[in-house]
Amino acid sequence: MRVTLSDTALRHIALFEDVTGASAVDCLVDDDRVCFLVATGEMSDAIGPDGTTVEQVEERLDKRVSLVENADTAELFVANALAPAVVHNVTISENASTVAYAEVDRADTGVAIGRDGETIETARRLAERQFDIDDIELA
């Protein structure tokens, strides 16, 4: 699926790549937060030692930054998007709409949902943009 990025998102990606040396595939910009979809295998570069690199990005943008690692399959992508929650299995159901059902430990349900639902909402937005998944439900 082809994703269209706003000028703001493109500027944020350029800054992110300049500071971290990692590649960003997509970017979601909210009022107080930016989420970067990091190229597969480049998450350690994006985070940096003890999180110092991503902290530099947060300081430069004056916003909280979250990172999601890209994946080749929709199932792994959904699991990555819900991290740090432990996801045991993801099943994709294609009926009237495409829904990803993610099996998460009961103890990690709150982590997968995130504060005010922001983790699962970000996962839903990215999954729709990258894999045409209409919804993510926790099982």
UniProtKB/Swiss-Prot annotation:
GO molecular function: RNA binding
InterPro entries associated with the record: KH_dom-like_a/b (IPR015946), KH_dom_NusA-like (IPR025249), KH_sf_prok-type (IPR009019), NusA_arc (IPR010212), NusA_bac (IPR030842)
Keyword Metal-binding attached: no
Subcellular localization(s) per the UniProt record: Cytoplasm
Source taxon at top rank: Archaea
KH domain segment(s): 97-139
Alphabetically ordered keywords of this record: Cytoplasm, RNA-binding, Transcription, Transcription regulation, Transcription termination
GO cellular component: cytosol
Main location per the UniProt record: cytoplasm
Gene Ontology BP term (one): DNA-templated transcription termination
Annotated Gene3D superfamilies: 3.30.300.20
NCBIfam families for this protein: nusA_arch
Stated family: Belongs to the NusA family.
Function summary: Participates in transcription termination.
HAMAP family hit by this protein: NusA_A
The protein's name in its UniProt record: Probable transcription termination protein NusA
